[in-house]
């Protein structure tokens, strides 16, 4: 009985050691911070052609979801890593327009709720890894906050926080949660670098550049070209499932 117990313990030890090989099949969770904005020569025109716009800084959001890693070489040097992530992206734009002798400033912040599906090729070199590949994103929600400041010629000014209703690029008024002026899907290229321990803990930094223009008012053929771009910093734990 004692010999059987020793053999069983030895087998379990070897199995765990193999399962913890960084090159084996893994599945787990990932999450972290997202810093996003818009890019493109026409990105500053998203509030409409009548406005002089200035894109704000990158907006802070977050991401969380499921990650996997499938080895495609026996030593684990190459692997494929599909993920399914919720990603809170967005942008900020400040617009100015003259109305008679008054200057109207509109500050608009827009939150974009995405489901991201990156499918990345990974090179695993010791704990260090590099990743590159495409990402498909589905926009399932949007929320707008807007503040209007009117500066009068006599030096007075008034600030109004509206209910989030806004006019899109083509001049159509939309509600704060309306996303019909935006493209529903995005295709992006992703590149990243990170470190993963043999036990499955990881820290990674990646950049995603969208290739499909975000603005799609569907009422004009002259929508400005503006593309999502985002940096993400992720912590993860991928449970080894063996090879």
Regions found by a protein language model. Give the residues of each.
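Sec-dependent N-terminal signal peptides
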Residues: 4-13
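Sec/Tat signal peptide C-region and signal peptidase I cleavage site
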Residues: 15-19
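Outer-membrane beta-barrel "beta-signal"
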Residues: 26, 227-243
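Membrane-embedded beta-strand positions of outer-membrane beta-barrel proteins
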Residues: 29-31, 80-84, 119, 130-132, ...
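Transmembrane beta-strands of outer-membrane beta-barrel pores
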Residues: 33-37, 86-90, 125-127, 136-140, ...
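Extracellular/periplasm-exposed beta-strand and loop segments of Gram-negative cell-envelope proteins
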Residues: 37-59, 89-113, 139-186, 211-232
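Transmembrane beta-barrel domains of outer membrane proteins
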Residues: 67-71, 120-124, 194-196, 204, ...
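Repeated loop/turn-to-beta-strand initiation elements of outer-membrane beta-barrel proteins
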Residues: 76-78, 127-130, 199-205, 241-243
